[in-house]
């Protein structure tokens, strides 16, 4: 015999919906099967409280109601049944029979039910439940001394373990949802149901289709960040959180936690962007500090700027090392020079104590870059003394300075000071003066030939007379005429002036002597 336990469309519990249950008590006394029933409470969908009941002989329907402490259950406002497996109406059948199975469930639960309950077929013509007297909640169970009590306890433990295992699997895979068909047309999700206290739409269960759009819109408002691009939103994760929890605020897929993680990523990206801008600014500043010849030839990007900076720093390091070496050498030379100077003073003091005349100390001669004769200044001497020149003497530093100064005074074409090149002669500003009453005195002009130095024949083309533009025109002009009066200062540098030798040699003897003194010079 088959007893049918049906959860009608208006309630969530299990009740009696078998036509044979409405028979008189006399007919029911002949039917004494043992059955076990599992009751699921609406306010605690994750826990199952199974109660066992036994239809004994000689008991009426009213007695069984009193024994089972039956409590009527109100119908759902939405008109749909919510079970631990979903929100669609589900039928459960307990008992022993030989007909085919009509129950559809997940693969794991289907295998468990087939192993425990066998194949159960509900009757086709069973009328639906229409009264609250046939919808009962079994809160108390009789003593589990019989066979039915032991079987119900084991069934309770197995079903609770299966439900908790499915819940853990669903938590591990938040985005994987599988549709489960019931009756071939209706679908429902494998997501675990959420208590009605956390529902935002006021429904008894958050798995209701009415609450899903609101939850999705709220999650969209919470998840999307103003600084994050649209592609960075994990849509699959968000939909999985909505399908699993809807309005759950304390689960693993909490939108607030996701928003917090997204905000942390945004702050991290902002810090990295600021650091990158700082590095780019420093590289640009470094490129501006490079030498122009280094930065003009190459394309200024980050790599070339850093490479050129490294090369330039190496060059600066080498220069610094070289400068330090030079400074150390200079210090060592200075210390050595001080030691030598102290030693020389000691030796001079020793010679002075011995009565030896100490020669005057002279500085070493200045090295000559170009060895060539230098014209000397005419010394003041008696009229009959012919001024002569000499080579630079190495006898002392004072003589060198005197000779160099004399040479500079002689060869300077811009010297406007009045110089007397010959003794007892007119001043230099009276030479070639316009309107002069008497010609200049050439009594010592014969000595001009003796100004030529002894070794000047071999270096006639290197004489400093070539530096004077007035001497390039005529070899008969003496060196005394190289410095005319300041009246001709502006005209002596003019290239249009051509000097004539006949106008400057009134005395034939002096002219002959001058010619004899300059016969070896070639001014071509």
Curated annotation (Swiss-Prot):
Q: Which domain of life is it from?
A: Eukaryota
Ranges where the record places region Basic motif: 263-276
Question: Which intervals carry biased composition (Low complexity)?
Answer: 16-39, 196-208
CDD domains hit by this protein: bHLHzip_MITF_like
Q: GO terms for biological process?
A: cellular response to toxic substance; defense response to Gram-negative bacterium; defense response to Gram-positive bacterium; determination of adult lifespan; positive regulation of gene expression; positive regulation of macroautophagy; positive regulation of plasma membrane repair; positive regulation of transcription by RNA polymerase II
Q: Which Pfam families match?
A: HLH (PF00010)
Report one GO cellular component: nucleus
Question: Where does this one sit in the cell?
Answer: Nucleus; Cytoplasm
Segments carrying the region annotation (Helix-loop-helix motif) are 277-316
Where would you say this protein principally sits, based on its record? nucleus
Q: What induces it?
A: Up-regulated by fasting.
Cross-referenced SUPFAM superfamilies: HLH, helix-loop-helix DNA-binding domain
Q: Where expressed (tissues)?
A: Expressed in the intestine and at lower levels in other tissues, including the spermatheca and the vulva. Expressed in cholinergic motor neurons.
**In which residue ranges is the amino acid composition biased (Polar residues)?**
77-93
Q: What is the documented function of this protein?
A: Transcription factor which regulates the expression of genes involved in lipid metabolism and autophagy in response to nutrient availability, bacterial pore-forming toxins or heat shock. Binds to the E-box motif 5'-CACGTG-3'. Under fasting conditions, binds to the promoter and activates the expression of lipase genes lipl-2, lipl-3 and lipl-5, and to a lesser extent, lipl-1, thereby regulating lipolysis. Involved in modulating longevity in response to TOR signaling, dietary restriction, germline signaling, heat shock and the insulin-like signaling pathway.
Q: How does it assemble?
A: Homodimer.
Instruction: Provide the family line.
Output: Belongs to the MiT/TFE family.
Its name, as the record gives it, is Helix-loop-helix protein 30
Per the UniProt record, the lineage of the source organism begins with: Eukaryota, Metazoa, Ecdysozoa, Nematoda, Chromadorea
Per the record, the gene is hlh-30
């Amino acid at each position: 015999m088959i007893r049918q336990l049906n959860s009608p469309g208006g309630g969530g519990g299990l009740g009696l919906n078998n036509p044979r249950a409405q028979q008189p008590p006399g007919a029911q006394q002949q039917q004494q099967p043992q059955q076990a029933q599992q009751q699921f409470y609406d306010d605690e969908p994750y826990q199952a409280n199974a109660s066992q009941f036994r239809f004994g002989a000689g008991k009426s329907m009213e007695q069984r109601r009193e024994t089972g402490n039956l409590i009527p259950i109100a119908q759902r406002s939405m008109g749909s049944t919510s079970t631990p497996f979903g929100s669609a109406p589900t039928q459960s059948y307990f008992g022993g029979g030989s007909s085919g199975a009509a129950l559809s469930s997940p693969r794991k639960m289907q295998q468990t039910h087939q192993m425990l309950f066998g194949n159960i077929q509900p009757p086709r013509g069973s009328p639906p439940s229409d009264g609250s007297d046939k919808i009962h909640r079994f809160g108390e169970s009789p003593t589990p001394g019989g066979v039915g009590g032991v079987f119900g306890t084991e069934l309770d433990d197995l079903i609770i373990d299966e439900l908790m295992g499915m819940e853990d699997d669903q938590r591990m895979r938040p985005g994987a949802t599988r549709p489960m068909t019931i009756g071939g047309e209706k679908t429902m999700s494998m997501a675990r149901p959420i208590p009605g206290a956390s529902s935002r739409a006021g429904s008894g269960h958050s798995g209701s289709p009415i609450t899903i759009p609101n939850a999705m819109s709220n999650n969209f408002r919470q998840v999307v960040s103003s600084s994050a691009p649209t592609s960075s939103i994990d849509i699959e994760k968000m939909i999985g959180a909505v399908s699993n929890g809807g309005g759950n605020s304390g689960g693993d897929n909490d939108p607030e936690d996701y928003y917090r993680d997204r905000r942390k990523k945004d702050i991290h990206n902002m810090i990295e962007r600021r650091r990158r801008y700082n590095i780019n600014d420093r590289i640009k500043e470094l490129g501006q500090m490079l030498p122009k010849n280094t930065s003009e030839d190459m394309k200024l990007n980050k790599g070339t700027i850093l490479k050129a900076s490294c090369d330039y720093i190496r060059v600066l390091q080498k220069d610094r090392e070289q400068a330090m070496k030079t400074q150390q050498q200079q210090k060592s030379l200075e210390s050595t020079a001080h030691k030598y100077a102290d030693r020389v003073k000691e030796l001079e003091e020793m010679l002075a104590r011995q009565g030896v005349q100490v020669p005057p100390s002279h500085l070493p001669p200045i090295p000559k870059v170009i060895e060539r004769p230098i014209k000397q200044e005419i010394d003041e001497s008696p009229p009959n003394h012919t001024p002569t020149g000499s080579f630079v003497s190495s006898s002392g530093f004072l003589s060198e300075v005197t000779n160099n100064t004399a040479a500079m005074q002689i060869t300077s074409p811009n010297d406007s000071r009045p110089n007397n090149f010959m003794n007892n002669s007119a001043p230099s500003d009276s030479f070639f003066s316009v309107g002069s009453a008497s010609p200049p005195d050439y009594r010592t002009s014969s000595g001009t030939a003796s100004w030529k130095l002894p070794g000047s024949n071999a270096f006639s083309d290197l004489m400093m007379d070539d530096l004077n533009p007035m001497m390039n025109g005529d070899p008969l002009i003496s060196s005394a005429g190289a410095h005319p009066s300041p009246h001709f200062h502006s005209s002596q540098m003019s290239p249009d002036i051509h000097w004539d030798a006949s106008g400057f040699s009134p005395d034939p003897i002096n002219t002959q002597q001058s010619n004899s003194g300059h016969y070896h010079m070639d001014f071509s």
